[in-house]
C-alpha cells in the first residue's frame, strides 16, 4: 500500500521529468538539417550555391552571413578594384625569365579562368538569374602603361609573347605618346613629350561589380524553396557527427541567441574570416596555414569630367625594389549607377582580417602550429616587410605624387582617400623553408570530403565560377563524373573541359556569345591559325617569388 502511495505522490514529478526528457530528445531530433551550409554571403558562396542549385536542385542550402546583408565585405564594389582579371594588363602575371624571355603560363591560366566566369554569368543572364548586364559588367579597355628604357623593353617583349597565343589577340601596342593619348588622354596630358613610354591596349577588358552579381545571385536563390539565408548570424562552433556530417552552432550577433544545424557538407567562403573558422573545425589540415592581413586604400575621383575622359583600366609596373603586389593602376569604375575613377592601391596595415572584423583577428588565428611559419615568411621576405612599412608611412602628399606619375595634371581637390577591403594572404607550412607565402587562392578540404574552405585573395572574385566548380569536384568526386552533372555543367559553362588557348574557333565563339549576352563591346576577329598552347620550356620566371600573386 505504501509503495502505491509513494508512486502516486511522485507521479507528477516523474511525468515532468519524462516530458523534459522527451522534449529534449525531440529537440535533438528536430535540429535544423541542410545538405549544404554556405558560410559567408559573398561572391564565392553565392556562385557555389548557384551552381549547386542548378546541378542538384533538390538539395537544401543554408547561407549564413555575419553582417546585415550579403556582399557588404570584400565583394562590395567599393572594397575592391572591380577588375575582370584576365591578365591583359597585369604585368605580375607575365614575369621575365632569367634568359630574358617572358613566361605567359600564369597569364593564360588567369585568362582561361575568367572566360569560365564570363560564360557562367552569361548563362545566368539567359536563365533570368542575373538581370541588366550593365548593372554588373561593362566593357572597359585594359591597358598596360610603362616608362623608362628597361620597362619599355619588357612591355615590348611581353606584347610579342602574348601575340603568339590565341587568348590575347586583338591587343595593340604603341610607344607613340600621341597614339597612347587617343587610348587614355589623362595619362599623357602634361607629360614630358621626350619621356620614353609604351602601352598595350585591348578592347576585351571589363569592369565588374562583384557586389551586384552577389546580390542578384542570392536574390534568385532566395526564390527557391530549398534555399535559406540567415543574416546577422555567425558560426561559432563545429562538431563532427558520427556520419561525418557537421553539427554547427550559429549565433545571432544581435541577440546572442544560439541555434544549431546539421549539415552534410560545409563550405567556408568567408573571405578574411575563413582561416579562423577553418581552425574552429578542428580538422588537422587547418594546422598547415596562417594568415597575414594587408589592407588597401584608393584615391577616388567622382568628378564627372575626369570620369568622362578616362574610360580605361591602366596598370603600371611596380617600382624598383617594390614587390609586384604594389602595381599601381588608374581604374575607370561604374559604381552605384555612376562613373568614377580610382587610383591605387596603397597598402595599409591592420590586425583585422575583415574590414568589419576584430583587431584581435591576427592574434586569435596565431597558434603554436603556425607561429614559426609566419616568422620564417617575415625573415625571407624583407623587401615585402620594407614595402609595407613604407606604405604605412605615406603622407597625403606622397600618395598624390604617386597619382601624378600616372595622371600628370591631376588636382588635389578632385580626389579623396577611401579605405577598401582587407586581404588575408596565405602562409603555408613548408618542409624546407618552414613557411612560405602561398600564391593565389587555395581550397582546403578534410579527408572525409565533407568540408571545404577557401583561403587566399588573388585573383579573387574574377575566378569565383571556376573555383566553385573546383570545390564541387573536390567534395563530390563521384557525382562530378556523372553524365547528369557533367551535362548540367556544360549548360552553365559551354566550353567546360576544353582549353580555349590554341583553339581559335572556340575562343572566338566564347568571346562573341558572352559579349552578346552580357552586352559588351563586340570582340575583335582573331586573325591567326590554331596556335600551339604556350609551353613553359624554360624555368618559370621568379617562381620562387611569393609576392607575385599577393592581392590588395
From Swiss-Prot:
Top-rank lineage group of the source organism: Bacteria
Keyword Flavoprotein set for record: yes
InterPro entries: FAD/NAD-bd_sf, MQO
Family recorded in the similarity comment: Belongs to the MQO family.
GO terms assigned for molecular function: 2-hydroxyglutarate dehydrogenase activity; L-malate dehydrogenase (quinone) activity
Enzyme class, UniProt record, top EC level: oxidoreductase
Catalyzed reaction equations: (S)-malate + a quinone = a quinol + oxaloacetate
Residue segments, region Disordered: 530-552
Assigned EC number: 1.1.5.4
One Pfam family recorded for the sequence: Mqo
Chain intervals with Polar residues compositional bias: 542-552
Protein name: Probable malate:quinone oxidoreductase
UniProt keyword annotations, A-Z: FAD, Flavoprotein, Oxidoreductase, Tricarboxylic acid cycle
Cofactor field: FAD
Amino acid at each position: 500500500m505504501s509503495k502505491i502511495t509513494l508512486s502516486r505522490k511522485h507521479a507528477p514529478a516523474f511525468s515532468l521529468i519524462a516530458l523534459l526528457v522527451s522534449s529534449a530528445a525531440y529537440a535533438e531530433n528536430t535540429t535544423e538539417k541542410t545538405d549544404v551550409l554556405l558560410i559567408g554571403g559573398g561572391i564565392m558562396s553565392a556562385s557555389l550555391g548557384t551552381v549547386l542549385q542548378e546541378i542538384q536542385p533538390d538539395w537544401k542550402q543554408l547561407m549564413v552571413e555575419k553582417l546585415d546583408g550579403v556582399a557588404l565585405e570584400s565583394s562590395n564594389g567599393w572594397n575592391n578594384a572591380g577588375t575582370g582579371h584576365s591578365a591583359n594588363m597585369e604585368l605580375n602575371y607575365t614575369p621575365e625569365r632569367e634568359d630574358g624571355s617572358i613566361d605567359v603560363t600564369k597569364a593564360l591560366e588567369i585568362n582561361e579562368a575568367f572566360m569560365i566566369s564570363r560564360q557562367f554569368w552569361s548563362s545566368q543572364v539567359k536563365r533570368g538569374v542575373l538581370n541588366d548586364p550593365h548593372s554588373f559588367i561593362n566593357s572597359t579597355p585594359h591597358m598596360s602603361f610603362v616608362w623608362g628604357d628597361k620597362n619599355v623593353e619588357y612591355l615590348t617583349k611581353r606584347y610579342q609573347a602574348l601575340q603568339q597565343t590565341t587568348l590575347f589577340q586583338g591587343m595593340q601596342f604603341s610607344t607613340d605618346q600621341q597614339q597612347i593619348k587617343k587610348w587614355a588622354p589623362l595619362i599623357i596630358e602634361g607629360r614630358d613629350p621626350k619621356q620614353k613610354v609604351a602601352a598595350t591596349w585591348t578592347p576585351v577588358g571589363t569592369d565588374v561589380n562583384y557586389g551586384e552579381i552577389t546580390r542578384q545571385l542570392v536574390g534568385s536563390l532566395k526564390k527557391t524553396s530549398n534555399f535559406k539565408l540567415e543574416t546577422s548570424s555567425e558560426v561559432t562552433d563545429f562538431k563532427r557527427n558520427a556520419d561525418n556530417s557537421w553539427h554547427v552552432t550559429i549565433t545571432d550577433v544581435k541577440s546572442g541567441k544560439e541555434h544549431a544545424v546539421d549539415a552534410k557538407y560545409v563550405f567556408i567562403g568567408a573571405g578574411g574570416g575563413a582561416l579562423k573558422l577553418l581552425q574552429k573545425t578542428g580538422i588537422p589540415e587547418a594546422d598547415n596555414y596562417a594568415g597575414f592581413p594587408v589592407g588597401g586604400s584608393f584615391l577616388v575621383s567622382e568628378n564627372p569630367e575626369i570620369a568622362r575622359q578616362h574610360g580605361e583600366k591602366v596598370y603600371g609596373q611596380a617600382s624598383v625594389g617594390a614587390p609586384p603586389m604594389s602595381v599601381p593602376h588608374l581604374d575607370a569604375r561604374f559604381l552605384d549607377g555612376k562613373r568614377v575613377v580610382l587610383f591605387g592601391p596603397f597598402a595599409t596595415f591592420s590586425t583585422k582580417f575583415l574590414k568589419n572584423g576584430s583587431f584581435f583577428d591576427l592574434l586569435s588565428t596565431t597558434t603554436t602550429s603556425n607561429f614559426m611559419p609566419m616568422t620564417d615568411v617575415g625573415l625571407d621576405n624583407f623587401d615585402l616587410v620594407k614595402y609595407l612599412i613604407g606604405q604605412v608611412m605615406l603622407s597625403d602628399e606622397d600618395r598624390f605624387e604617386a597619382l601624378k606619375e600616372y595622371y600628370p595634371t591631376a588636382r588635389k581637390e578632385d580626389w579623396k582617400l577611401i579605405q577598401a577591403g582587407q586581404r588575408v594572404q596565405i602562409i603555408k607550412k613548408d618542409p624546407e623553408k618552414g613557411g612560405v607565402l602561398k600564391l593565389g587562392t587555395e581550397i582546403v578540404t578534410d579527408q572525409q570530403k565533407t568540408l571545404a574552405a577557401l583561403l587566399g585573395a588573388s585573383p579573387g572574385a574574377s575566378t569565383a565560377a571556376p573555383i566553385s566548380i573546383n570545390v564541387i569536384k573536390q567534395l563530390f568526386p563521384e557525382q562530378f563524373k556523372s553524365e547528369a552533372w557533367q551535362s548540367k555543367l556544360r549548360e552553365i559553362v559551354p566550353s567546360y573541359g576544353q582549353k580555349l588557348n590554341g583553339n581559335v574557333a572556340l575562343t572566338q565563339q566564347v568571346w562573341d556569345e558572352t559579349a552578346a549576352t552580357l552586352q559588351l563591346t563586340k570582340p575583335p576577329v582573331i586573325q591567326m591559325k590554331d596556335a600551339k598552347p604556350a609551353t613553359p620550356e624554360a624555368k618559370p620566371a621568379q617562381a620562387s617569388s611569393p609576392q607575385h600573386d599577393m592581392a590588395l
